[in-house]
Design a protein with these regions (language model features):
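Hot-dog-fold acyl-thioester-processing enzymes
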Residues: 2-89, 154-165
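HotDog/MaoC-like acyl-thioester-processing domains
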Residues: 1-15, 95, 99-104, 108-165
Length: 165
């Protein structure tokens, strides 16, 4: 899937205080181990027994794995059908509870601020808070950061000369 060449969601479609809930991904032991082998090979992400001996009490997903899952859920929910231009970064990220095999994750996004980019007025900035919730509605991760979105194009004149006197 790629970003839409004619997106339906632009900067103007984000409203201050708006809350969106999206995603439902059930984490498997196999994907926890696969991600950990590639990107975060700490024992408690690779082996159930090592996980049980850790403060997590079982095989736990890497926090970076959880972040990658959030990114995918954001893409599926709205980014791929938007005028997204990327992100200048996150202001904070906190891992609050371990994500274990069998957990089903979803995301609650709250729009905290919207404003045009001062140096590039055709781009709008959106600051959001994301809370990642498991199937028990426990918050396992919080993030806050900015997204950049293209602004909605001005409507084209219907015919040459329209609006002239």
């Amino acid at each position: 899937m790629t970003i839409s060449s004619s997106p339906t969601h632009h900067w103007e479609d984000f409203s201050l205080g708006e809350v969106r809930e999206f995603g439902a991904h059930t984490v498997t032991a196999e994907e926890i181990v696969r991600f950990a082998r590639e990107f975060d090979p700490q024992p408690f992400h690779l082996d159930e027994e090592a996980g049980r001996a850790s403060l997590f009490g079982g095989l736990a997903a890497s926090g970076w794995h959880t972040c990658a899952l959030v990114m995918r859920m954001m893409c599926d929910a709205y980014l791929l059908d938007s005028s997204s231009l990327g992100s200048p970064g996150l202001e904070h990220i906190k891992w609050l509870k371990p994500v274990m095999a069998g957990d089903t994750l979803g995301v609650r996004m709250t729009v905290l601020e919207t404003r045009p980019m001062a140096s590039k007025p055709h781009i709008g900035l959106v600051r959001c808070a994301w809370a990642v919730l498991n199937q028990r509605r426990e918050t396992v991760l919080t993030m806050e950061g900015w997204g950049m979105f293209g602004r909605r194009p001005a409507p084209a004149l219907a015919a040459a000369g329209e609006g002239q006197s």
